[in-house]
Amino acid sequence: MILRGEGKSKIFVIVSVTAMMFMQYAAALDLGGIKPVNPLDPRPGTYQDVVNQPSYVLKKGTLSRNAIKNHYTIAMEKFMQSNVRSSYQDFKMLIETVVPSDYVYMRLTQEMASIGFFSLAELSMSRIQDNQISGLLEEDVKNYYFPSYKLNNKDQLYLAEIYSNIMYNEQSKEATNELMKQTKLLTDSDYANYLVAFGSMKNGDIEQAEKSIDIAIDKNPKNINYKRLRAEIYSQSNKPKIALKYLNELNSANINTVVFDTELHSSGQYILYKAATNDYLKKYHLAYYYYDEGELAKALRVLQTSISGKKNINKDVFALTSMVYFDMKEFEKAQDYALKAIDIDSANSEALIVLGKIALRNNDLSKAETYFKKASAKDKTHTAEIKLAEVYQKQNNVKKAKEIYSKILRVSSKAYEAYYKMALLEHDREEAYLKKTIAINPNFQDGWLDLARVEINKGAYDNALSYLGIAKYIDENDYRYYYYLGLLLKGKGLTDDAKRNFETCLNMNPDYEPAKKELKI
């Protein structure tokens, strides 16, 4: 029997790190038993099956077994077991009791909306203090997930349990059939029709899925997630060309943040994988999906079986393989595959960018400049132009670098790296540019570190601690964290603690000159 509830989440934990009350933000929990669906399985899953899993790993910290972790684990287990009312209350308590942090609230806002706990997303959103950092993500969450028809709590929990049963309990047919009996709810609610479409697709009833998703979109034409599902539904129909049409519409969606931009690209690759008829092209898109998801080993395994007799496919396979190897820090292999790609297509921007990055890494500025200039002609992401400006900075041509960054910012609202570089070049606008950087990409660690530096210089140590905590969560092995924490402790007069952190920084990077200077080495 179906009651009322919702479905998946990733979450954060606050853990103490230093004796001076430092709070670190840890990630969502891996509940262990459920693994992402393998799209190559004989019984294919959906994009929702693949991504809607509690798969984030808990970051280690001194309180990694604390009550907050246990609280989250219990809430998520209840949700997956369709004990949605109790799960809702547990998540609500977590939002209300977590140590205040805009970063944590931003993530909770996104994750609660993604599972249909819209009122909890609003609760988390209401606790955010700095709109300069959170505003863009909040707007994306609303455009991507929020229904146009505001559900009362009873209906919200009911639909959440429908989703839970479709998603986790192998009751998609029963749950969908039950929901289709709720005439009043389907008449009013766009989200209810979305769930019928999702459940019907999962059951293989593509005709009903098409009908229901069209109703959902008619009721809420701004919802990006509905449009994403529509493209996926048609990719599994006998009308794949229509799926590609809808996918192209998705590509022009009004997205503000890298978080959702990446989500759309990832789901787009999954839809292309579903729609492709050529086996090699199918594998290429599946590999790109894994690459977008950070599953580099899986991407590489698929790419190794993607080489075909057609050069127009191979050039893209070689370019993507070079990107995977570069991210795996296997630079020689990355270079080899990038060269293979440009042997087929000399203007392949992805391969040229990889070659430029390798040249820049080797301090061959002339070669890097050549590669990035050539790549920028076809690169719509502005990555090549940003890297070209970095080359000019290394050549002490700051004027030329600023011209490029300014040009990018005139045409792109999501070029967070350009905002970041401008922050470092224009100190009178540094804080505003850094906050814009973080607003576009909340997971960009360098932005948080530099915000901490700005606050340390102002003597605003509490703010600096908060920013440092976020930076440490993103990469707990970054030596710069210990350097800036050392500066903070030094500013507070805790010289022994400061010294220990400078020493830790040098243990991690013996060549880091600022830490050497602090220790007078």
Regions found by a protein language model. Name each.
Residues 63, 97, 131, 185-186, ...:
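Structural marker of alpha-solenoid helical repeat scaffolds
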Residues 25-103, 114-119, 123-126, 132-141, ...:
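N-terminal leader/linker segments that initiate helical-solenoid repeat arrays
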Residues 67, 76, 101, 110, 135, 161-163, 189, 198, ...:
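Residue-level recognition of tetratricopeptide repeat
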Residues 70, 104, 138, 158, ...:
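TPR alpha-solenoid repeat register
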Residues 80, 114, 168, 202, ...:
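Register position in tetratricopeptide repeats
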